[in-house]
């Protein structure tokens, strides 16, 4: 196939990829004209019909010998980096094209790619009508299997009529196989529209990769593993019409044995060894002389489907089949006998235990499920220990143990007869010994409809025991006669081998009133037998005595205790970290509670405790859990705790009934007052251009600011000369005086020391009041009292009242008015205190005002 490809930039800036499959004997052209089949726009360097081309089939039937002829009509055209002249012709042979040929058009340039794709398809004989159309678009077709390798195989499998030799050839040669529907759709839709629909590459790739057109669903690469099943099987055939069959099977290392006729094939089969597998290939599927004959199509289908054993024969398979049938019948009969044979009861003689084992405590095997995920096993150990010790009791030579079958049908109907039969031997023993009281009770615990997985059925059955026989009280339900203390048979069958819980467990029958009374009687007898101490009872191997013997042993007892303590400690540790999740804990509401969850180490200090009326600490969570039916917030979660922010009581008391923002506002207002009093601020003005910190005139102002910053933390003595400070203040007043226009007129301002708040600026809240001259005496008294309070603090603080010599008109009027008012008040104040004499207090401020009136 000849395919031309190029890309073009459209008006909107997007790139269009164009590909077209060329039809034989048809002329194509590329240019800016819309009459061209292939159009290139938005490039003035390309002619309206820049280049024309067509391909032709030579006299040879092989399409590889076809050629593509190019005619250049444009000004800027280069082929393989060489410019072509206008009207120049160039021919490209398909056999010489190893890679695509590229032609560049225009100044940009636009690359045009011409490629020859060699396509050889093998089609069935009944689809030859498509060969002409396929050849026009450069696709070669073959019908028979020859040495020319094919790129694609068209098949009608499994409806093929050629014995599926073509499919076998395709599988062996790993040639993709497509259905005949693929060929029809390609010739009817894709190829005819390739001239108008310039997206040939996309449509071609979509059809080739579509799995709907595949004959087999599996990957051809795994076909080798499927044919490997024939390696150990001999393939026999009488087909002579397929000469390539042997070479195809030899590809998978399969040996094919060909015979002239079927008789010679049977003779070869008879000469084979026993249990040899072989496969017979013929022209028809049939079964003859007990042998399976199949065709190539059937063999291929069985290999692909994995049912190859259905067509394989084996030498001597018939005799082996009979033997297998007999063996199956025998095995079925034996299984039936084993299922039906079952002993209901087995009588066993008492087991004599070794004396050495009496001094050793039994260590039960570790149950991994109970050890790692279960609870403490102290209860289970006590039950197993008591049952084991009870089995070891030696109750005499005539005693027998009755082992009941674990499966007893209709247990509810046999409960009462079983207890009655169990009580009969006691009366017989009483008669033989000369006593009228009941005797031994044979204790048996068959499985009465209940299932207990923790104990074996043999462990549930207990040995028959006899009761000790000192004078006993009357027992209701058993008899009214007393039991004497002289019978040794009663002593050897003491029921004290079981505690109250075990007796009730062995005789427990749900919802049965006839068994409740005997169990109570036995409990009374067992309780009474524990209080008896006699020489006969000492000889009896009771669990109490045996336990005391075990406790006397040193090393084994300590070893067992260490094992049990380790197990219990590990179980507690695992249970503290592994908990069971409930369905309620996985709901969305429960998961949302985790946002206030914090995982901490378990500690008693984290639990908030309350005090009761007597002053003792009690846990609130425990009382809440005991008094209510609801579970706590994090039940059984020791390391879960919900933290709630609690405000201190002092702040809560102050802010009670107030808005939460008032506290922050109070702090912000207080900070504003502090910064306003101690940080000099300057109002920005466009007209204020005289103040420059780089000039020499402002050196005193900068020094004054530095003194204010460090003055609050600097303690100075009274002996420091104040003339330096007075000179700096006078220099400062020269810059800040608004009436500096009058020559020779200047305000002299001096003071000896700043004491308290008398010389400082009034607070903000007092600035709204105007002080009258009549109240200056009261102010002087207040300032004297404040000076006495701060005698120990000798701080020199200089306040800068106005550092801006040139202000706006509005600011100058305000400052002049305030300064004149202050001058008058201070002048009168200084005049009144000027003639006080030396008796005045030296700590008070001394002011002197001089002003010339012009």
Curated annotation (Swiss-Prot):
One of its GO terms (biological process) is meiotic DNA double-strand break formation. Residues 444-455 have a biased composition (Polar residues). This is DNA repair protein XRS2. Residues 820-832 have a biased composition (Low complexity). The modification Phosphoserine is found at residues 349, 533-534, 553. The gene is XRS2. Present with 358 molecules/cell in log phase SD medium. It comes from the Eukaryota. One of its GO terms (molecular function) is DNA binding. Keywords: Chromosome, DNA damage, DNA repair, Meiosis, Nucleus, Phosphoprotein, Telomere. Component of the MRN complex composed of two heterodimers RAD50 and MRE11 associated with a single XRS2. The MRN complexes dimerize on DNA to form joined MRN-MRN oligomers required for DNA double-strand break repair. Component of the MRN complex, which plays a central role in double-strand break (DSB) repair, DNA recombination, maintenance of telomere integrity and meiosis. The MRN complex is involved in the repair of DNA double-strand breaks (DSBs) via homologous recombination (HR), an error-free mechanism which primarily occurs during S and G2 phases. The complex (1) mediates the end resection of damaged DNA, which generates proper single-stranded DNA, a key initial steps in HR, and is (2) required for the recruitment of other repair factors and efficient activation of ATM and ATR upon DNA damage. It is found in: Nucleus; Chromosome; Chromosome, Telomere. Residues 429-455, 807-854 are annotated as: Disordered. Residues 28-50 form the FHA domain. GO terms for cellular component: chromosome, telomeric region; Mre11 complex; nucleoplasm; nucleus. Its main location: nucleus. The modification Phosphothreonine is found at residue 555.
């Amino acid at each position: 196939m000849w395919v031309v490809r190029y890309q073009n930039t459209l008006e909107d800036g997007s790139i269009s990829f164009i590909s077209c499959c060329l039809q034989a004997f048809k002329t194509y052209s590329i240019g800016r004209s819309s009459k061209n089949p292939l159009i290139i726009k938005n490039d003035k360097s390309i002619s309206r019909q820049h280049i024309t081309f067509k391909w032709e089939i030579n006299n040879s039937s092989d399409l590889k010998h076809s050629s593509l002829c190019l005619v250049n009509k444009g000004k800027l055209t280069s082929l393989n980096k060489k410019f072509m002249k206008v009207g120049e012709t160039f021919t490209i042979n398909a056999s010489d094209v190893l890679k695509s040929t590229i032609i560049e058009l225009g100044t940009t340039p636009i690359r045009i790619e011409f490629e020859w794709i060699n396509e050889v398809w093998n089609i069935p004989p009944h689809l030859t009508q498509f060969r002409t159309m396929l050849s026009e678009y450069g696709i070669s077709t073959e019908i028979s299997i020859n040495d020319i390798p094919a790129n694609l195989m068209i098949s009608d499998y499994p409806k093929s009529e050629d014995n599926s030799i073509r499919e076998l050839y395709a599988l062996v040669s790993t040639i993709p196989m497509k259905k005949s529907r693929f060929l029809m759709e390609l010739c009817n839709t894709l190829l005819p529209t390739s001239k108008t629909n310039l997206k040939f590459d996309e449509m071609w790739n979509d059809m080739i990769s579509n799995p709907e057109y595949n004959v087999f669903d599996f990957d051809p690469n795994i076909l080798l593993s499927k044919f490997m099943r024939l390696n150990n099987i001999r393939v026999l055939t009488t087909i002579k019409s397929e000469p390539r069959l042997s070479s195809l099977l030899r590809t998978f290392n399969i040996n094919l044995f060909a015979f002239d006729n079927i008789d010679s094939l049977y003779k070869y089969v008879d000469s084979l060894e026993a249990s040899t597998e072989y496969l017979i290939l013929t022209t028809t599927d049939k079964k003859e002389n007990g042998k399976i004959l199949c065709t190539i199509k059937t063999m291929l289908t069985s290999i692909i489907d994995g049912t190859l054993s259905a067509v394989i024969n084996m030498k001597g398979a018939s005799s082996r089949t009979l033997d297998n049938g007999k063996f199956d019948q025998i095995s079925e009969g034996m299984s039936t006998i084993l299922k039906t044979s079952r002993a209901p009861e087995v009588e066993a003689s008492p087991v004599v235990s070794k004396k050495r084992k009496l001094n050793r405590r039994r260590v039960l095997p570790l149950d991994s499920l109970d050890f790692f995920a279960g609870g403490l096993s102290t209860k289970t150990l006590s039950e197993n220990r008591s049952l084991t010790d009870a089995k070891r009791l030696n109750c005499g030579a005539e005693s027998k143990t009755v082992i009941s079958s674990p499966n007893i049908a209709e247990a509810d109907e046999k409960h009462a007869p079983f207890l009655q039969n169990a009580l009969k031997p006691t009366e017989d023993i009483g008669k033989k010994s000369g006593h009228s009281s009941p005797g031994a009770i044979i204790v048996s615990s068959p499985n009465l409809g209940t299932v207990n997985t923790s104990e074996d059925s043999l462990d549930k059955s207990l040995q028959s025991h006899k009761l000790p026989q000192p004078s006993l009280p009357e027992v209701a339900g058993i008899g009214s006669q007393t039991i004497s203390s002289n019978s040794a048979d009663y002593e050897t069958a003491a029921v004290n081998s079981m505690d109250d819980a075990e007796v009730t467990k062995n005789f427990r029958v749900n919802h049965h009133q006839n068994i409740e009374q005997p169990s109570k009687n036995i409990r009374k007898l067992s309780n009474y037998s524990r209080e008896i101490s006699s020489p006969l009872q000492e000889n009896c191997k009771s669990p109490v005595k045996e336990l005391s013997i075990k406790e006397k042993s040193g090393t084994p007892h300590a070893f067992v205790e260490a094992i049990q303590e380790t197990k219990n400690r590990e179980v507690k540790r695992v249970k503290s970290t592994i908990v069971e999740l409930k369905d309620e804990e996985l709901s969305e509401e429960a998961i949302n509670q985790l946002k206030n969850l914090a995982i901490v180490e378990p500690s008693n200090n984290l639990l908030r405790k309350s005090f009761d009326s007597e002053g003792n600490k009690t846990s609130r969570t425990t009382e809440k859990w005991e008094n209510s039916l609801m579970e706590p917030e994090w039940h059984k979660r020791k390391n879960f705790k919900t933290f709630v922010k609690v405000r201190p009581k002092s702040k809560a008391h102050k802010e009670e009934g107030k808005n939460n923002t008032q506290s922050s506002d109070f702090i912000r207002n207080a900070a504003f007052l502090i910064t306003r009093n101690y940080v000099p601020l300057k109002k920005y003005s466009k007209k204020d251009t005289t103040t420059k910190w780089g000039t020499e005139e402002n050196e005193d102002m900068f020094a004054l600011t530095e003194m204010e910053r460090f003055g609050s933390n600097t303690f100075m003595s009274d002996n420091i000369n104040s003339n330096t400070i007075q000179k700096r203040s006078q220099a400062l007043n020269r810059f800040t005086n608004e009436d500096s226009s009058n020559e020779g007129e200047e305000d002299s301002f001096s003071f000896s020391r700043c004491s308290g708040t008398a010389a400082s600026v009034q607070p903000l809240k007092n600035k709204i009041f105007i002080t009258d001259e009549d109240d200056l005496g009261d102010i002087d008294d207040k300032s004297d009292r404040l000076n006495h309070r701060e005698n120990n603090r000798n701080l020199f603080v200089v306040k800068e009242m106005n550092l801006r010599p040139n202000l706006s008109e509005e600011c100058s009027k305000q400052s002049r008015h305030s300064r004149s008012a202050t001058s008058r008040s201070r002048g009168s104040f200084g005049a009144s205190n000027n003639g006080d004499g030396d008796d005045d207090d030296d700590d008070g401020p001394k002011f002197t005002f001089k002003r010339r009136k012009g």
